[in-house]
Curated annotation (Swiss-Prot):
Annotated TRAM domain residues: 378-440
Residue intervals passing through the bilayer: none
Protein name: tRNA-2-methylthio-N(6)-dimethylallyladenosine synthase
Highest rank taxon of the organism: Bacteria
Protein residues bound to [4Fe-4S] cluster 1: 11, 47, 85
Family matches, as Gene3D superfamilies: Methylthiotransferase, N-terminal domain (3.40.50.12160), tm_1862 like domain (3.80.30.20)
Domain Radical SAM core: 143-375
Localization per Swiss-Prot or TrEMBL: Cytoplasm
Function text: Catalyzes the methylthiolation of N6-(dimethylallyl)adenosine (i(6)A), leading to the formation of 2-methylthio-N6-(dimethylallyl)adenosine (ms(2)i(6)A) at position 37 in tRNAs that read codons beginning with uridine.
Length: 446
């Protein structure tokens, strides 16, 4: 049987797309492999958010060129595909830089992958168009991959933040209909999925057609999904502060399937830098939004994204970011040094922050965020919480899952609990995971 190796870089959307490309190839008779050396088709599903991520792809392509040659010497053909946002942004440039690549395909065209692979027998192929048809209408049924699953409901972004390539690589905001999303969710649950994370570049800008033909909000969509039998939990990511509607806030208080966790990027605490980033909100507007969300769901866990060293950022600007982090308190966060991306307005600026200053600021920010994360996890010790068991744990007799607040937990229980929700008493907080015991385990130890 033919074998396909699919490697994904970057965001949850890419993870979803990688899985769907594997589904497309499976429908053509390819079995998935984790061993690139035995693959007849190698797909790199790429990320273009930061320069380092893009350069990793070219390093990997250099290694694949050698592998392709070695397999050819032993009589095996290998097709190499570059997909995702680097493919969309760089197109034919990839063919120039990486001679071993056979197919370059953008994120809106991967449903055509079988045809593109056939065409590549004759000539190298680039498809980075934004097709008129909806790719989701041409994708095969999804294969079950576990207890949790991503489900794309929205793609693209109209915000045009000054640092971001997404509007150029993913296009304008488009949303799937409520019916299409509910249908895919129902099939996921029938396959064993119990928690679904709704994903989009700007997921709370969701505006797919509802049952009456009128645009529905993300809150309305989650209400519809809560009626899917067997679905236990709902999450969503990534959101923009400017699209946070009242009904979405209300969903955190009224919909029992919506988990008390929110990833809401702010990027900076400085109003001057937020304006330069074209974020169209202030630090205080973000604070007020968080206050409203916490009023609706007091126990909600908050996560965010931060960029340090954006062009023109001063010590005073960075101090405002540190103040915002201190004011709000996060359970987790992602922070990065600014990386210029070609074609974005920020890349044209000449007031770059020195690399050494970026490094120093990032270290200070990450130290504060790490302290907040450790404090948040430590506060969980002694609490009783419901864990959705996702898989076996690191040690025999152990399983692993997540709290409603997206904290990883390890505890002793049989593998038969996978896919169920188990009450667990948290007994210890590690650096990245919590540890606990079931009520039965605690009683036995007493």
């Amino acid at each position: 049987m033919k074998k396909a190796y699919v490697k994904s870089y970057g965001c949850q959307m890419n993870a979803y797309d990688a899985g769907r490309m594997a589904d497309v190839l499976a429908a053509e008779g390819y079995s998935a492999t984790d061993t690139v050396e035995e693959a007849d088709v190698v797909v790199l599903n790429t990320c273009h958010i930061r320069e380092k991520a893009a350069e990793k792809v070219y390093s990997e392509l250099g290694r694949l060129r050698v592998l392709k040659g070695e397999r050819a010497e032993s009589g095996h053909d290998t097709r190499i595909v570059v997909a995702g946002c680097v493919a969309q942004a760089e197109g034919r440039e990839i063919l120039s830089r990486a001679p071993a690549v056979d197919v370059v395909v953008g994120p809106q065209s991967y449903h055509r992958l079988p045809d593109l692979l056939r065409q590549s027998r004759e000539t190298r192929v680039v498809d980075t168009e934004f097709p008129a048809e909806d790719k989701f209408d041409h994708l095969p049924a999804r294969r079950n991959r576990g207890v949790t699953g991503f489900l794309t409901v929205q793609e693209g972004c109209d915000k045009f933040c000054a640092f971001c390539v997404v509007p150029y690589t993913r296009g304008a905001e488009v949303s799937r209909s409520v019916a299409a999303v509910v249908d895919e969710a129902r099939r996921l649950v029938e396959g064993g999925v119990r928690e679904i994370t709704l994903i989009g570049q700007n997921v709370n800008a969701y505006h797919g057609n509802g049952p009456d033909g009128a645009p529905a909000t993300l809150g309305h969509l989650m209400d519809a999904l809560s009626a899917v039998p067997g679905l236990l939990r709902l999450r969503y990511t990534t959101s923009h502060p400017n699209d946070f509607a009242d009904d979405l806030i209300a969903a955190h208080a009224t919909n029992p399937l919506v988990m008390p966790y929110l990833h809401l990027p702010v990027q900076s605490g400085s109003d001057r830098i937020l304006h330069a980033m074209n974020r169209r909100h202030t630090g205080d507007a973000y604070r007020r939004l968080i206050e409203r969300i916490r009023n609706a769901r007091p126990d909600i866990a908050l996560s965010s994204d931060f960029i340090v060293g954006f062009p023109g950022e001063t010590d005073a600007d960075f101090a405002e970011t540190m103040r915002l982090v201190s004011d709000i308190g996060f359970s987790a966060a992602f922070s990065f040094k600014y990386s210029p991306r070609a074609g974005t307005p920020a890349a044209e600026r000449e007031d770059a922050v020195p690399e050494a200053v970026k490094t120093e600021r990032l270290a200070a920010l990450q130290d504060l965020l790490d302290r907040q994360r450790h404090a948040y996890n430590a506060a969980s010790v002694g609490t009783l919480t419901e864990i959705l068991v996702e898989k076996t744990g690191r040690h025999p007799g152990q399983v692993a899952g997540k709290t409603p607040h997206l904290q990883a937990v390890q505890f002793d229980a049989p593998a038969s609990t996978i896919g169920t929700v188990v009450p667990v008493r948290i007994t210890r907080a590690g650096s990245n995971s919590l540890f606990g015991e079931t009520l039965e385990g605690a009683a036995a130890a007493a």
